[in-house]
């Protein structure tokens, strides 16, 4: 409230109200008392102030109170810079900054005579946007137009010009303090204060003028040049801009500093925990007049905790750096880490939470302090002077944990204290929705009082062990449980009863009582006035204490003020705790810089000199020199000998192992889990393609290409290259040739360094230039360095900062339609925030590795983090996860002596000494044994003794993890020096594992590695850690993070003792232990006690005899029962070329190494195992891998149908004794030695619970959304963990995903649709999985480019008519003379007729009846298909898209759909006996094919060409394609098949399907059948096409005749083609060469255009009725092509002469066999049918639509679950009560006849000498029966049936041509008759007319009908017997 208004109140009245309010808030626990300002100002009976009231009575007020206390515990001031921005405009104007009453802000009166109208400046010029929107406004360079809001004109925006340096950038950063603006109206320039400017433009504010509050929008010009409101000015983001209060440390990133740099704004994963609500008061302003300056000390950063839980305060408050005291010093950057000496350093202050309003009120985001405020006097009692030499005297740098209330200001030696916001957010009440509160078991009303918070904090501190450090996540759960208990208690109490709160009087003694059990480790200091008193007292006591005096670990300072309520903070004094807390505030980058600084500036010199002597006090260097001299020139024997045996260096260098271990590194395998995950990835890609978002069109691509981006690690690059080469993926994807793939692999792996930009641009060029290639960008280890480009450019950080963001999130990547992004990570938590760019549905998680179940024949199981934690319960004497207690004690002693050094420096120096002395103790100075920790000693003993035990020279690897590069280099130099002086340089190698450099290994060790490998070229050097398998070595692994490198099976020890309290995030900690994760023998997990409990002696004895080895192998290879075993889809032993027998032989020949050898990560299932050996024999294996995707592809376009895959096979898991190098001993996990801090988090696992590392903040780049959140459940799968993190974590400002904020319009976040995330534990095999994914993705794309076509041999070839006349081979066209003399072959040869009735020929009569096999017709026969590659001449369905046929397929604009016009076309049909009205839908672009009436409205005809036309770019015949149920799958895109030439294509569709076809084929002409044919079969479509075409031919003849063209010159042919015709081929017979061999057939794919143009060029074509081509089969022989033309049936694709066939009709009733029926009619009319045998048609197997059967159901459904209806139920007796069916009568009849031959024609079964006589029809009456087709028409040509006795007579809807002359045919005795008619009366008339009763006997019960209701017009039939 400031002093501005103080004088307006009577002090007595103020104090009374104030005390009442405080008292009420203390007494009250449920009812919220009214805020005191409401009592004072808003009482209804309050009189207006009299002038007497408004007297300055400041002296009567408690100054401290006035300065510090307001209603919200916030501060108010009249004349400062800072912001207290409210979200709402209205709130802005209704509340002052302190939420005091809206007393108008006192502005200077406007100059006399000036304009004061709202919306105009004082010069009277209009500033409103509506007036200026069309004006051209000139503004100076560097200025922007912005919009200001005036409270008096809410609907208007005022236009201003502001210097953009004073505005924030897009990320809310970098706005200079102050203001510079110009008036757009009158042109006045140079306003330097916003207050002054706001007066000039008449804002008339009721509150303090602030640019942040009143400058609202950027103004932008639209494309029309109109100035309009643009985006909001991003002031909000300023909140995160400030840095913390700086301590006066000497350098930027001192570990002692409480500074949090602007780059990170983090305290090791914790956002500093308070939010700015208000800034410091300005000068006291007496009587309302503000003084402009002050000389008092600067009070530059007083900020307080908002009691209203604001959105920001959940986790985002930040600490600030104090700056110079001048108000408008523009040159000073707020993040400056070097404040001027002698200034006060403000420490974040936390205001008390008053009980004046509900704790969970609406959030009020408030903007933090962005600059320097006016200085103001600092009240006494508010300051703490830090004593000089505090750290030096006490050896402790105290850490002050911000608690609850206002922290004081610190003066003096502030570098010796640290202020930590670690727990501050735990004391805030976050804003949560009710549903979230309910999930947590809380209500909105019951939260903890401050008193309870204080007691809980003390309780927590007491409970912490002496080695434990307060952990924010742990304390949050304690607070949550306490709140849940309160809620439960509240619910349990009766309504009206109250929980008794802790009273202020009780608090001190309760606090002391709780602390009393802590054995003096927790002290409580209670003060009355302020926290400053308690802190001062604590620091003073500390500075006066002597080192030997015992300090408490924690001092809890409580200020029990009657005025302000209770406040508290915690001063951490524990040596270990204070250091750990201070160090944990630094990010990894910061503490590495800190260490670097300490090393560079020589701060470590004291420590270094300490370690110059051994533990016994000897000078280390001199001692080593002495040992070296004693040894002379000789060195310890490299292997196969004791440590005491020495040889000359030359001899040592020449020693090569006698044994070739044949590591067989190049053999590569894919294992079932990897295959499963690869398929999961593939199915997710398919899901994206099918999602309807149209973000991925897989049909578009024919190739797969990729690039793998890895972090900056040379070894990782080489490792990935090795995987790519071994997997053979480049050859499999067709990207490289076999010979060059090895060299060319390098262009596919790029690391994130400064060169990535150029390499990536090359890649993106490839992406743009190859639109038909699907590119996959794999971002491996994608959690590493995921910082944003912007934060990288602003901070002086690592060179890799923001590189990943620049690549992965650049616009080109997001927009490229042919680019998939696959992010791969073992620790994906940083990618799973609320701002994640990856949809949770696009995450693919590694399959659950459940070790509890029997996994059958899998010999290796994954041993990961949770297995390490669980192993602690196994009770083995040598646990796998260890903490070196002795080492920790030594460290603690040293840390006390060197308080100013970072603990990692101290730890590292000690570790170097430990290893050095262990080496000396084991070789020359046994007296040092007692001074090395047993852990270190045993590791070194194992390391240097194991090579001596065998002739192979194999040994173990030890990893020492040293994150700081400088420390790592120091360690390497020091250890190398000790090793060399001890003569061990040939015994083991020391390697620096620096990500930035390649591996460097001594020549003699390289020679040893080469001899083991056996087949390496001369220049080979190890490039990956796996190449070092078996080499005894120490790898000093350095770098900020481990980057996913895989370690060899010989890794035995992983020393993580340097990984301490700086690693308090889940990712940081788990990725370190991830180094040791690997696959182990399953015995390790099944029977760990036996497998792992081997003492040293037992290890030596464990070398197994040959017999043992034999038995073990047999056991290993035996498949387990009840297994979830791996099936040998692609990685089985046999497929990989390693049989179990050869394995056994091989491994028995090897000598066996000691049994405790960890495989770590072996070749098999380590990162990136791939599909099979890359050698020549791999081809078959690779083809097998996609068994789930259909048959494999052969080398040509076709291949044989694939057989089913083989059964389960045993898989060789890595480390199984296949390679023979390790013998059959168990593969064991490495031993991990941890620091105490890491061990307490990873080793504290209760049974079955997640390691408690999982409860930590997941990553330093993210923040918790709220301190109230459920615990990460132990049973959560990785999918559930992902959802948890997506709900409860946010990306920090420097995170690459931070910019992916909510879309204000839709309220959703933008996921990148083509981005996937693959997550799996470290070293589980993810690389192999994604390489396999690339392979099967390519296989699938090829599969999409393949088509399944029918591949069936012709049927009935043994009884076709011999051609008496044949043409010579090689003739392109038939000769009409000789062709007409050929007999017609009435047998149907199309394989689809294989289950239909044979057509009788004289030759058939001689066929033995046994030849025809009986087939179960109930079971639909699976037709043979084969996969072939689509070619450029294929017909396509809607799933094909390409640039060429886009116009053909789609409309160019949305309006074009309506451009199609609907035309009715009517003609009369004699067959139907009525007029038929069809509809044409004609797109505008196709209207040229039609003739319209003069008015252009009426469709007259479809244009036809002339017979004589010769146009190479057109086909003459219109193409008609009847289609039903295949709007998506029908092959109706003929663009490529017709080579893009103009053609007339008409889709013939049913009326009800027209909208669907029109939607999918908008550019096609549709011919819509009348509604009466909606249920008709394909016969109706063919009938109407032919009728329409003939009618059109007549119309065209008439039209062209008028133009003088003869009628016979008009082209009479149409093409009738099925919607499944996909490819066309031309065949020729190859001439046999000189040696006798079978004549071959050569085939070539040709276009439909070629076929049609060739057939249309047939001489005298108008004399042929039908022309067609044969069906393709892979079994086409030269024999079948011998005759180039056949006179026989043609199907599916025909050229039909509508003129000649005018009187031959398709049967429009038919569903089946309509084409054979029509062919027989045509032939019997004496017309020519010609088949071109040198062309063939491929038909696609389309699984939907077409002539699919109706699902026959009862017309009235009685119940849903009815038994299937059998074919014999399709008919019934007339007028019976039979179940009536809902299906067309004709359909029921045809289906019935197919199955009823036994009943209808018993004499005809298998009796082909006596066929059934069918008059004028061919119907399928079953394959057991032959039909003799006879036409009743006069002069028709029929088969010779003299002497044939028929077994039956079929009369189907016979017309008047059928007469009584049927009596001339002879029938067997007992032959049967079936007469079918439309109705009962015509049935009777037919029997009478044909005099059937003379020869046939009928019974009344032999009359039937189809089982339709009478409405559906059933068909009737009568059966009879020949007499």
Swiss-Prot record:
Protein's name in the database: GREB1-like protein
Major site of localization recorded for this protein: membrane
Bias-annotated ranges (Low complexity): 252-262, 1195-1206
Effect noted on mutating residue 1066 to P: In RHDA3; probable loss of function; does not rescue renal hypoplasia in zebrafish morphants
Membrane topology note: Single-pass membrane protein
Subcellular location: Membrane
Keywords from the named record: Deafness, Developmental protein, Disease variant, Membrane, Non-syndromic deafness, Transmembrane, Transmembrane helix
Origin superkingdom: Eukaryota
Pfam family for this entry, one: cpSF2-GREB1
InterPro entries given in the database record: GREB1, GREB1-like_2nd, GREB1-like_C, GREB1-like_cpSF2, GREB1_N, TAGT
Biological process annotations from GO: branching involved in ureteric bud morphogenesis; cardiac muscle cell differentiation; cardiac ventricle development; embryonic heart tube development; kidney development; male genitalia development; mesonephric duct development; metanephros development
Ranges annotated as biased composition (Acidic residues): 87-96
Transmembrane regions: 1843-1862
Family recorded in the similarity comment: Belongs to the GREB1 family.
Comp. bias regions, Polar residues: 263-278, 296-307, 1119-1161
Region feature Disordered, mapped onto this chain: 87-111, 246-326, 1101-1222
Functional summary from the UniProt entry: Plays a major role in early metanephros and genital development.
Tissue expression profile of the protein: Widely expressed, with prominent expression in the cochlea. Expressed at high levels in fetal kidney. In adult tissues, highest levels in vagina, cervix and epididymis.
């Amino acid at each position: 409230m400031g002093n501005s208004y103080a004088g307006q109140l009577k002090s007595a009245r103020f104090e009374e109200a104030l005390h009442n309010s405080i008292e009420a808030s203390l007494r009250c626990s449920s009812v919220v008392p009214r805020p005191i300002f409401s009592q004072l100002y808003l009482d209804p009976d309050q009189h207006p102030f009299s002038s007497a009231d408004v007297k300055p009575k400041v002296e009567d007020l408690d100054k401290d109170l006035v300065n510090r206390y307001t209603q919200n515990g916030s501060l108010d001031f009249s004349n400062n810079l800072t912001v207290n921005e409210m979200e709402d405009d209205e709130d802005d104007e209704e509340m002052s900054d302190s939420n005091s009453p809206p007393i108008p802000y006192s502005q200077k009166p406007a100059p006399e005579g000036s304009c004061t109208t709202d919306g105009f400046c004082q010069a009277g010029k209009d500033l409103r946007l509506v007036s200026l929107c069309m004006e051209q406004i000139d503004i100076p360079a560097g200025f922007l137009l912005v919009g200001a809001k005036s409270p008096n004109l809410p609907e208007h925006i005022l236009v201003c010009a502001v210097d953009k340096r004073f505005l924030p950038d897009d990320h809310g950063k970098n706005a200079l303090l102050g203001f510079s603006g110009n008036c757009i109206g009158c042109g006045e320039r140079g306003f330097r204060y916003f207050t002054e400017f706001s007066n000039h433009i008449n804002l008339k504010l009721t509150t303090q003028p602030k640019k942040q509050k009143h400058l609202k929008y950027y103004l932008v010009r639209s494309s029309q040049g109109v100035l309009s409101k643009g985006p909001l000015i991003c002031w909000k983001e300023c909140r995160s801009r400030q840095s913390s209060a700086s301590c006066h440390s000497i350098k930027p990133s001192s570990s002692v500093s409480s500074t949090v740099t602007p780059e990170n704004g983090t305290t090791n994963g914790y956002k500093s925990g308070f939010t700015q609500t208000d800034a410091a008061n300005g000068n006291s302003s007496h009587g309302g007049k503000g003084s402009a300056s002050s000389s008092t000390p600067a009070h530059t950063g007083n900020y307080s905790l908002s009691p209203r839980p604001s959105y920001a305060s959940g986790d985002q408050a930040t600490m600030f750096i104090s700056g110079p005291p001048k108000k408008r010093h523009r040159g000073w950057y707020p993040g400056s880490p070097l404040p001027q000496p002698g200034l006060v350093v403000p420490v974040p202050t936390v205001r008390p939470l008053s009980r004046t309003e509900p704790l969970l009120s609406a959030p009020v985001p408030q903007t933090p302090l962005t600059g320097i405020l006016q200085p103001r006097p600092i009240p006494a009692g508010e300051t703490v002077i830090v004593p000089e030499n505090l750290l030096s005297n006490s050896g402790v740098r105290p850490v002050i944990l911000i608690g609850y209330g206002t922290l004081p200001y610190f003066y003096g030696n502030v570098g010796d204290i640290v202020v930590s916001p670690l727990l501050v957010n735990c004391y805030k009440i976050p804003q949560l929705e009710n549903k979230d509160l309910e999930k947590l078991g809380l209500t909105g009303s019951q939260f903890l009082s401050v008193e309870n918070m204080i007691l809980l904090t003390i309780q927590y501190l007491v409970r912490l062990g002496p080695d434990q450090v307060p952990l924010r996540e742990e304390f949050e759960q304690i607070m949550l449980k306490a709140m849940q208990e309160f809620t439960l208690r509240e619910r349990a109490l009766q309504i009206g009863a109250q929980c008794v709160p802790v009273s202020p009087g009780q608090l001190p003694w309760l606090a002391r009582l709780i602390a009393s059990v802590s054995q003096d480790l927790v002290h409580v200091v209670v003060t009355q006035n302020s926290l400053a008193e308690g802190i001062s007292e604590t620091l003073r006591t500390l500075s006066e204490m002597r080192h030997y005096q015992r300090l408490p670990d924690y001092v809890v300072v409580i200020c029990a003020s009657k005025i302000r309520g209770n406040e508290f903070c915690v001063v951490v004094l524990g040596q270990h705790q204070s250091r750990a807390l201070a160090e944990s505030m630094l990010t990894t980058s910061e503490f590495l810089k800190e260490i670097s600084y300490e090393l560079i500036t020589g701060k470590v010199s004291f420590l270094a000199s300490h370690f110059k002597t051994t533990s016994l006090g000897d000078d280390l260097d001199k001692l080593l020199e002495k040992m070296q001299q004693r040894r002379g020139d000789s060195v310890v024997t490299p292997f196969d000998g004791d440590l005491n045996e020495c040889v000359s260096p030359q001899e040592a260098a020449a020693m090569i192992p006698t044994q070739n271990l044949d590591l067989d590194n190049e053999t590569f395998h894919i294992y079932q889990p990897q295959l499963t995950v690869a398929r999961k990835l593939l199915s997710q890609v398919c899901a994206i393609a099918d999602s309807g978002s149209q973000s991925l069109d897989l049909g578009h691509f024919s190739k797969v290409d990729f690039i793998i981006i890895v972090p900056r690690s040379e070894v990782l690059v080489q490792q990935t290259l090795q995987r790519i080469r071994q997997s053979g993926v480049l050859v499999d994807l067709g990207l490289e040739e076999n010979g060059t793939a090895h060299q060319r692999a390098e262009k596919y792996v790029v690391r994130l360094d400064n060169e990535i930009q150029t390499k990536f641009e090359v890649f993106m060029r490839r992406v743009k230039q190859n639109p038909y290639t699907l590119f996959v960008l794999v971002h491996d280890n994608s959690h590493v360095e995921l910082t944003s480009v912007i934060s990288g450019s602003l901070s002086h950080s690592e060179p890799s900062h923001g590189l990943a963001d620049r690549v992965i999130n650049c616009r080109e990547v997001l927009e490229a339609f042919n680019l998939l992004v696959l992010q791969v990570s073992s620790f994906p938590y940083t990618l799973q925030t609320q701002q994640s760019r990856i949809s949770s549905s696009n995450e693919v998680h590694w399959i659950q590795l459940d070790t509890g179940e029997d996994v059958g024949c899998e010999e290796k199981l994954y041993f990961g983090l949770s297995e390490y934690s669980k192993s602690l319960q196994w009770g083995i004497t040598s646990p796998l996860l260890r903490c070196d207690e002795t080492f920790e004690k030594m460290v603690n002693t040293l840390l006390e002596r060197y308080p100013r050094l970072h603990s990692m420096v101290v730890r590292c120096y000690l570790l170097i000494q430990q290893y050095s002395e262990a080496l000396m103790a084991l070789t020359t100075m046994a007296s040092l044994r007692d001074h090395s920790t047993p852990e270190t000693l045993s590791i070194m003993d194992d390391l240097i003794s194991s090579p001596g035990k065998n002739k192979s020279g194999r040994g173990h690897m030890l990893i020492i993890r040293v994150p700081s590069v400088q420390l790592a280099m120091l360690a390497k130099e020091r250890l190398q020096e000790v090793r060399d002086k001890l003569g061990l340089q040939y015994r083991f190698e020391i390697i620096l594992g620096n990500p930035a450099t390649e591996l460097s290994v001594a020549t003699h060790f390289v020679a040893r590695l080469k001899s083991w490998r056996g087949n390496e070229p001369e220049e080979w050097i190890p490039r990956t850690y796996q190449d070092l398998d078996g080499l005894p070595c120490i790898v000093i692994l350095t770098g900020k993070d481990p980057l996913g490198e895989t370690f060899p099976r010989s890794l035995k020890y992983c020393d993580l003792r340097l990984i301490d309290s700086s690693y308090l995030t889940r990712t940081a900690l788990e990725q370190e232990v991830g180094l040791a994760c690997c696959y182990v023998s399953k015995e390790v997990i099944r029977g760990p006690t036996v497998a792992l409990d081997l003492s040293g002696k037992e290890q030596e004895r464990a070398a197994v005899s040959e017999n043992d080895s034999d038995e073990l192998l047999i056991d290993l290879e035996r498949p387990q029962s009840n297994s979830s075993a791996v099936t040998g889809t692609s990685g089985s032993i046999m497929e990989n070329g390693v049989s179990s027998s050869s394995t056994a032989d091989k491994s028995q020949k090897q000598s066996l190494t000691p049994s405790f050898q960890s495989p770590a990560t072996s070749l098999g299932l380590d990162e990136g195992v791939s599909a099979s050996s890359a050698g020549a024999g791999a081809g078959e294996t690779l083809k097998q891998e996609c068994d789930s995707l259909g048959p494999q592809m052969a080398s040509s376009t076709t291949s044989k149908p694939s057989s089913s895959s083989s059964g389960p096979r045993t898989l060789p898991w890595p480390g199984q004794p296949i390679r023979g190098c390790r013998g059959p001993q168990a593969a064991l996990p490495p031993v991990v030695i941890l620091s105490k801090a890491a061990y307490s988090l990873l080793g504290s696992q209760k049974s079955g619970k997640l390691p408690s590392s999982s409860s930590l903040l997941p990553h330093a780049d993210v923040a918790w959304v709220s301190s109230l959140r459920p615990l990460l459940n132990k049973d959560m799968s990785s999918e559930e963990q992902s959802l948890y993190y997506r709900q409860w974590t946010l990306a920090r400002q420097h995170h690459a995903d931070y910019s992916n904020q909510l879309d204000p319009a839709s309220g959703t976040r933008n996921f990148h649709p083509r981005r996937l995330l693959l997550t799996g534990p470290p070293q589980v095999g993810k690389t192999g999985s994604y390489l396999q994914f690339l392979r099967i993705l390519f296989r699938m794309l090829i599969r999409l480019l393949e088509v399944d076509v029918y591949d069936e041999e012709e049927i009935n070839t043994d009884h076709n008519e011999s051609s008496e006349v044949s043409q010579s081979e090689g003739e392109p066209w038939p000769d009409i003379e000789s062709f007409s003399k050929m007999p017609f072959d009435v047998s149907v040869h199309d394989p689809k007729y294989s289950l239909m009735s044979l057509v009788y020929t004289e030759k058939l009569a001689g066929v033995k009846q046994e030849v025809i096999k009986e087939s179960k017709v109930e079971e639909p026969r699976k037709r043979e298909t084969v996969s072939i590659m689509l070619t450029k001449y294929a017909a396509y369905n809607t799933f094909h898209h390409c640039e060429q046929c886009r116009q053909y397929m789609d409309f160019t604009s949305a309006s074009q759909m309506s451009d199609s016009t609907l035309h009715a076309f009517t003609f009369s049909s004699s067959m139907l006996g009525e007029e038929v009205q069809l509809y044409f839908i004609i797109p505008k672009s196709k209207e040229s094919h039609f003739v319209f009436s003069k008015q252009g409205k009426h469709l007259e005809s479809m244009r036809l060409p002339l017979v004589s036309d010769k146009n190479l770019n057109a086909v003459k015949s219109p193409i008609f394609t009847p289609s039903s149920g295949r709007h998506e799958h029908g092959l109706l895109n003929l663009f490529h098949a017709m080579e893009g030439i103009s053609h007339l294509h008409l889709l013939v569709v049913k009326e009800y399907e027209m909208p669907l076809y029109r939607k999918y084929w908008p550019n096609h002409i549709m011919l819509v059948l009348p509604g009466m044919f909606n249920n008709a079969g394909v016969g109706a479509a063919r009938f109407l096409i032919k009728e329409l075409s003939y009618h059109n031919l007549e119309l065209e003849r008439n039209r062209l005749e008028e133009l003088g063209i003869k009628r016979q010159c008009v082209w009479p042919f149409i093409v009738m083609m099925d919607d499944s015709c996909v490819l066309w081929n031309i065949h020729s017979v190859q001439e046999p060469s000189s040696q006798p061999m079978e004549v071959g057939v050569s085939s070539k794919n040709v276009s439909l255009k070629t076929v049609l143009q060739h057939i249309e060029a047939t001489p005298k074509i108008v004399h042929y009725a039908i022309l067609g081509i044969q069906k393709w089969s892979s079994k086409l022989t030269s024999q079948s092509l011998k005759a180039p033309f056949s006179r026989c049936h043609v199907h599916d694709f025909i050229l039909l002469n509508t003129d000649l066939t005018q009187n031959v009709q398709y049967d429009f009733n038919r569903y089946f066999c309509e084409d054979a029926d029509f062919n027989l009619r045509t032939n019997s009319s004496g017309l020519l049918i010609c088949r071109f045998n040198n062309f063939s048609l491929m038909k696609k197997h389309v699984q939907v639509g077409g002539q699919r059967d109706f699902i026959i159901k009862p017309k009235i459904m009685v119940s849903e679950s009815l038994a299937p209806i059998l074919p014999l139920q399709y008919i019934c007796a007339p007028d019976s009560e039979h179940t009536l069916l809902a299906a067309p009568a004709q359909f029921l009849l045809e289906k019935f006849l197919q199955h009823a031959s036994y009943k209808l024609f018993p004499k005809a079964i298998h009796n082909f000498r006596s066929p059934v006589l069918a008059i004028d029809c061919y119907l399928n009456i079953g394959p057991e029966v032959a039909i003799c087709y006879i036409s009743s028409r006069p002069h028709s040509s029929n088969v010779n049936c003299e002497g044939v006795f028929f077994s039956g007579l079929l009369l189907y809807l016979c017309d008047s041509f059928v007469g009584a002359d049927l009596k001339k045919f002879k029938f067997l005795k007992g032959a049967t008759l079936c007469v079918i008619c439309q109705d009962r009366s015509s049935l009777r008339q037919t029997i009478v007319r044909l005099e059937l009763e003379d020869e046939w006997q009928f019974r009344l019960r032999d009359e039937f009908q189809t089982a339709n209701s009478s409405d559906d017009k059933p068909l009737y039939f009568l059966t009879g017997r020949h007499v």
